[in-house]
């Protein structure tokens, strides 16, 4: 946020607030009673009813939304806050007013899916007038995955069969695509829904196809071309598993996008364990590479602004990790990778400090809740229940992946 004085203190984004509250709750911090505040109650201010949309949105109102960030014009920005809010409400149940908001979100998503009727070929959707629009950004058909996830959570919470019906309808709209339409962060949620329904509802959705669409990325010239999972080494650093653009400047990974898929993918293996080895391998690589966004964990010569790293306390990361600098900084010529950010590009005169990103760092508690080190270097204990929301969890479930060619013994 820009502080209490700029724009009446109202310029802040729910993607930051919700992700931070979720991550904190997952690692045991009570955000309903911290420093004299109930942050979980406060975050309800992102519920937009005055504009008639009646869902959680990325900003509190349209006036500040025009200052930046997605709001009412970029579909994933309007769907993801609702998935995050449902997750927050499972971690922090029984907060006054939350159930009313959750019910409203579910009803709006049912109405939207009914109107869309299998056709998600839009850049964004007006949840007041129930109409889809195409603008200058690519169509985001993977918003259907976000709809499906929220409606599955709503079905678990409220038991309304309409929510399950439209969860399936949205998922079928996603699966009916002819190619990957991976846009930002919603497709992985759809993969989870497909696996869950296959295990619990007797469906036969093609989970492998959805995984391919995430990992191989969008290859359509009409979509967000190149958006997928990065594989390989940049210089001496292994960056396999990170998510972002496979093609932009040879590769451009983002921390937020690298963290978020762990939320649906790790619990998914409970429902389709044939993917356990692949997901375990991905998570080991991804979690290792995620450290490279933090200024205290990557060599200074690979950072755009190493002289500023102390302001982060190594809690706030760079927004991105590029294969090569795209600002033309002389000292970074031939250096790969480079910890970097887009902040200075958004508004002329933005300082280098804007490369450090709360937006990117806020969901890190998701990794904190899932990952525990074992007594064998390179073998992680991954908690498959940590981010499996609104389901019965009668016993602990952990995923261990052994990257070695020999048998290893871990202490449980």
Task: Say what each PLM segment does.
Residues 1-412:
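Catalytic domains of carbohydrate-active enzymes that cleave complex glycans
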């Amino acid at each position: 946020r820009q502080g209490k004085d700029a724009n009446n203190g109202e310029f802040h984004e729910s993607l930051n607030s919700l992700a931070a509250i979720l991550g904190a709750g997952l690692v045991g911090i009570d955000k309903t009673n911290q420093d004299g505040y109930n942050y979980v109650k406060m975050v309800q201010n992102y519920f937009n009813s005055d504009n008639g949309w009646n869902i959680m949105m990325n900003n509190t109102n349209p006036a500040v939304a025009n200052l930046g960030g997605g709001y009412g014009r970029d579909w994933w920005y309007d769907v993801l806050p609702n998935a995050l809010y449902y997750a927050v409400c499972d971690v922090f149940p029984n907060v006054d007013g939350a159930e009313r908001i959750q019910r409203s979100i579910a009803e709006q998503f049912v109405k939207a899916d009914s109107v869309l009727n299998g056709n998600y070929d839009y850049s964004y959707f007006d949840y007041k007038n129930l109409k889809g629009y195409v603008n200058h950004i690519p169509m985001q058909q993977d918003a259907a995955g976000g709809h499906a996830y929220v409606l599955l959570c709503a079905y678990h919470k409220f038991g309304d069969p309409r929510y399950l019906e439209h969860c399936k309808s949205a998922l079928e709209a996603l699966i009916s695509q002819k190619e990957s339409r991976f846009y930002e962060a919603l497709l992985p949620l759809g993969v989870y829904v497909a696996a869950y329904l296959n295990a619990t509802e007797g469906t036969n959705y093609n989970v492998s196809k959805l995984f391919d669409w995430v990992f191989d990325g969008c290859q359509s010239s009409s979509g967000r071309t190149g958006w997928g999972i990065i594989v390989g080494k940049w210089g001496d650093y292994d960056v396999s598993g990170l998510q972002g653009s496979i093609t932009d400047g040879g590769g451009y990974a983002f921390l937020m996008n690298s963290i978020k898929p762990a939320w649906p993918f790790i619990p998914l293996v409970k429902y389709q364990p044939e993917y356990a080895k692949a997901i375990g391998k991905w998570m080991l690589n991804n979690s290792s590479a995620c450290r490279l966004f933090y200024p205290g964990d990557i060599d200074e010569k690979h950072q755009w602004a190493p002289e500023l790293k102390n302001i982060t306390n190594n809690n706030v990361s760079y927004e991105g990790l590029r294969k090569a600098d795209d600002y033309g900084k002389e000292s970074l010529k031939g250096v790969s990778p480079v910890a970097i950010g887009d902040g200075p590009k958004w508004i002329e005169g933005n300082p280098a400090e804007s490369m450090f990103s709360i937006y990117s760092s806020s969901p890190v508690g998701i990794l904190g809740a899932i990952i525990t080190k074992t007594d064998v270097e390179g073998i992680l204990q991954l908690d498959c229940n940590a981010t499996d929301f609104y389901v019965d969890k009668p016993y602990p479930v952990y995923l261990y992946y052994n990257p070695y060619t020999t048998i290893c013994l871990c202490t449980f």
